[in-house]
Amino acid sequence: VPVIAAKWGWEMAFLVIGAIGFIWMGFWIFMYKKPHVHPLVNKAELDYINQDTIAETKANNNVEVKEKKIPFLQAFKFRQTWAFAFGKFMTDGVWWFYLFWTPAYLSDVYGLTSDTTMAKTLIFVLYAIVMLSIIGGWLPKYFVDKLGMNPYAGRMRAMLIFAFFPLLALLAQPLGHTSYWFPVIIIGIAGAAHQAWSANLFSTIGDMFPKSAIATITGIGGMAGGIGAFIINKGSGALFDFSSGTTLINGKAEVMTKEFLAAGAQYLDMPMKFFGFEGIRAGYFIVFCVCAVAYLIGWI
């Protein structure tokens, strides 16, 4: 995306990425088939896919029971729905904050704009670290297979462990005084923890609800996560403007920027100070603190 934006502008970056999405949608529409009719799925693979269904059928003396669907509004009467939705509300926004604001963070705090080689390298390393999230599928399986825990308890224990890793975000700003590598690595670890957490959170739906309700509960959780993401990203932008202070430009109060400051502009409202950080750095520290504790709150 930075390469496209630097060469053809940010508008073209949106268009190109969006077009790729439509191409992928075309593959999905024309190539996807249900496993039992897909020509490339052999019997062994089909049996593996259907192993849970086969086991359930045998457990019910080979009599399939038609599950009753849960109406949308009825789903809100279950505590489990609110538990899942709250977990999504608290944590989805953290991922989107890191995704959207990390390039701006590197630019605001370290002067590394997205078109520089170092910024691209840092972003690449960050997302490479996020790939560690594959552990998210292994750990609960270990608890279930090796320790004999039931699937739900195993997933919840794994999620609790993953919820502690984002606490490293509390150190992103303090260690960032030494090198920009520290916050980048920490954000990468927090991102990996989020994806591991999120994968297990989605899996808990199947533990708490029948198959007929999974789509409904997933949709409710997605809605809650979207609301949380909107709040944290919109709120972060407002906080960063507020923490930067203001200056008077042509008789109008404007957010103080590095460019205004370099041109000799004077502060109308002084920048925020918080725990030794000043200006937009203080704003980022506050948001990092929120992101750090969000998973433990969501787990509870």
Residue ranges and their predicted role:
Residues V1-P39:
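Helix-loop-helix hairpin linking two adjacent transmembrane segments in secondary transporters
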Residues V1-W8, L106-S107, L139-P140, V144, ...:
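Interfacial helix-cap and linker-helix signal at transmembrane-aqueous boundaries
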Residues W24-Y32, L167-L175, G276-F277, Y284-I300:
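Multi-pass alpha-helical transporter architecture, strongest
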Residues P35-A85, V109-L112:
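Juxtamembrane intracellular "pre-TM" segments in multi-pass secondary transporters
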Residues L73-W138, A190, H194-F202, G206, ...:
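Extracytoplasmic gate region of multi-pass secondary transporters
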Residues S114-T116, K211-I220:
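Loop-to-transmembrane helix entry/capping segments in MFS-fold secondary transporters
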Residues V144-K146, I205-I214:
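Paired intracellular helix-loop junctions of major facilitator superfamily
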Residues Y152-N200:
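C-terminal transmembrane helical hairpin of 12-TM major facilitator-type secondary transporters
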